[in-house]
Amino acid sequence: MVGKLLRRNYAVPGGPLRWVSFEFPLQDASFPATVASLCAEEQGKYWEMHDMIFAKIESWANQGNPNGAFVDLAKDIGMDTREFKSCLDKRENTRRILASKQFGVDLGVTGTPTIFINGQAVPRTNQFYSYQGLEQVIQQEAAAAATAGE
């Protein structure tokens, strides 16, 4: 929910933030969900699928192969399911995810979400887990960056 609010309010063209998202699956079960999000990206539906995967986690998390559940979600958000199914088996998705995760490891990422502002990881305090807390950090960093640029 916090990520959705941040994307809606800050990740806008010409806005104060450049929103960059990297794949960083933490558990075996999250790897196929990450692939599903990348396949949705091919149809311009990355964030819709991402948000749906989290909203419907109970429908897929305990399945050995959750691809059927992801196809159902793809259908629910208006995707071409034939194209989506074909994408789920592409090897380049695995390579892309592993490279993205390694990039995160190289930056010191140990969990999700991890948020960087002006190249620095935002500490995971109680403030980090609320929209208002993150908004306050963003505004403080934006003000500091503006002052430094004067």
Give short role names for the model-derived ranges.
Residues 1-75, 80, 139-140, 144-149:
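Structural alpha/beta surface segment adjacent to cysteine/selenocysteine redox centers
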Residues 1-10, 71-150:
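C-terminal cap of thioredoxin/glutaredoxin-like
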